[in-house]
Amino acid sequence: MIAYEKLPLDNEVKAALEGLEIEYVFQPIFYKDCVRIYAYEALMRPKKMTVGQLIDEFARDEKLHILEVATFFGATQAYIERGYQEYLCINSFPSESFTENEAEAFDTYFGNQKGKRIIEILEYPKVSLREWVRKSEMVQNKHWKVSLDDFGMGENNMNAVYLYTPDIVKLDRSLICGIDNDARKQENVRTYLESFHERGMQVCLLYTSDAADEA
């Protein structure tokens, strides 16, 4: 479990985080040669409920900010402990960003952490331009990359591409499942790829055995 009590955070936030009993697992993201690892995506694994249940509960109580802080601090701590050298991909709510005190605490505890980070903007719950401005300042100062998660779902559409100008776009599996036998999907994906590549963006496909079975 992540030792949140050791992190330099407000007592209220620490108390909430300590009660979550969260661990993190790391899913490798490969280069297109399917051999070399490009990044590790930190995936939250709460002990007492599913991730979806946890997010729904905190969204209902308007406390998603706590999960945002938990993910950045907890995932970074777990990543460093594992000794990984590849990029660390951290999920981030589009409606949240660090406070000034939290940003300072992050730098104090972990160092400046320049480079080797990818902030992956989730497709829910809602987009906040104010929070994105604050988040983008941190991203630029630290030379981090921005990834758009599950493009084609929720808030992550072309408007999000225009707003975030991400370095990486991850296509949602709904866009590609069954694409071999679906001319419309083929044309849609081709159009998206051309648009992303024209903007110098990389495209990532999340491969799973289920997706392979459906394709």
Model feature map: region roles:
Residues 1-7, 87-92:
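Flexible, glycine/charge-rich interdomain/linker segments that couple
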Residues 2-57:
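Active-site core of bacterial EAL-family cyclic-dinucleotide phosphodiesterase domains
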Residues 23, 87-89, 116-120, 145-147, ...:
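Structural preference for beta-strand elements that scaffold enzyme active sites
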Residues 29, 93-95, 122-124, 151-153, ...:
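Active-site beta-loop-alpha junctions enriched in small/polar residues
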Residues 35, 71, 119, 150, ...:
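Conserved, mostly hydrophobic/aromatic
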Residues 65-134, 144:
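Catalytic core of bacterial c-di-GMP phosphodiesterases, primarily the EAL and HD-GYP domains
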Residues 98-105, 129-130, 151-201:
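Bacterial c-di-GMP phosphodiesterase catalytic domain signature
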Residues 207-215:
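Single conserved hydrophobic/aromatic residue that forms the stacking wall/gate
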